[in-house]
A protein has these predicted regions:
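Class I SAM-dependent methyltransferase SAM/SAH-binding core
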Residues: 21-72
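A short beta-strand submotif of the Rossmann-like class I SAM-dependent methyltransferase core
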Residues: 83-86
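Class I SAM-dependent methyltransferase core
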Residues: 17
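Structural signature of beta-strand start/N-cap positions in the alpha/beta core
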Residues: 14, 42, 77-79, 109
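Short conserved AdoMet
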Residues: 10-11, 38, 91, 105
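Conserved alpha-helix/loop element of class I SAM-dependent methyltransferases that forms part
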Residues: 1-13, 28-33
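A short acidic, Gly/Pro-enriched loop at the edge of an enzyme's catalytic core
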Residues: 71-81
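S-adenosyl-L-methionine-dependent methyltransferase catalytic module, highlighting the catalytic core
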Residues: 20, 70, 91-208
């Protein structure tokens, strides 16, 4: 699960979770990243959705705030900033990275995941629905290892670790979604990860 892969890269104790609600607030789901982070670390969360933050507060979740990922200001620094499936939604990814850097302690870490646009799954989706190439209409851009590395370098980060992972969500009941994943899983036994994995997971550190 993506959340478990992200957790392996997080250093504490202080963690900022950007986009903390996820697509939906799912505290009862094992893959809900914000819940997993709170089990291990001292976590602050921000999300642009007022309704999702209100819902989370109604569940007793504290230290969460309605703020935008590319303009947030919290007045403190963190050991790790986590941004799971956020950067592809933003109008200004570079400005987002600049805000993250301001909120990291020296030698702090940014852990980021984003769809890998050259995955076979996305190629199959595009072939089926072209000119629509992405199921999520709120995505504004695609990244690959080269482009995300260069963008990060321009904003004062360097890559510490990266890998390609799967992002299968067992809570999705769509028959077509599950058929896609069954096909990808089968092909994954025959083809390299660079063709079958769907998500990039990267840990960055601040350049001195």
């Amino acid at each position: 699960m993506r959340a478990d892969e992200i957790l392996e890269l997080v250093n504490g104790p202080a963690v900022l979770d950007i986009g903390c609600a996820g697509h939906e607030v799912k505290p009862d789901q094992p893959g809900w990243l914000h819940g997993k982070l709170r089990e291990r670390f001292q976590v602050t969360g921000i999300d642009i959705s007022e309704s999702n933050i209100a819902h989370m507060k109604s569940l007793g979740i504290q230290d969460i705030h309605v703020q935008s990922a590319d303009s947030f200001e919290l007045g403190r620094q963190y050991d790790t900033v986590v941004a799971g499936e956020v950067i592809e939604h933003l109008s200004n990814p570079g400005q987002f990275l600049a805000r993250v850097r301001k909120h990291l302690v020296p030698d702090g870490r940014l852990v980021l995941s984003t769809p890998y646009g050259f995955s076979l799954m996305y190629a199959l989706y595009a072939a089926n629905y072209f000119p629509k190439t992405c199921a999520n209409g709120e995505h504004a851009c695609w990244f690959c290892p080269t482009t995300i590395r260069e963008l990060a370098r321009r904003e004062g980060f360097e890559v510490e670790k990266w890998r390609l992972i799967d992002d299968y969500d067992p809570s999705v009941t769509s028959r077509k979604y599950r058929l896609y994943w069954k096909l990808i899983h089968t092909l994954g036994k025959l083809l390299p990860d660079k063709l079958t994995k769907t998500t990039m997971l990267i840990a960055f550190k601040c350049l001195s």
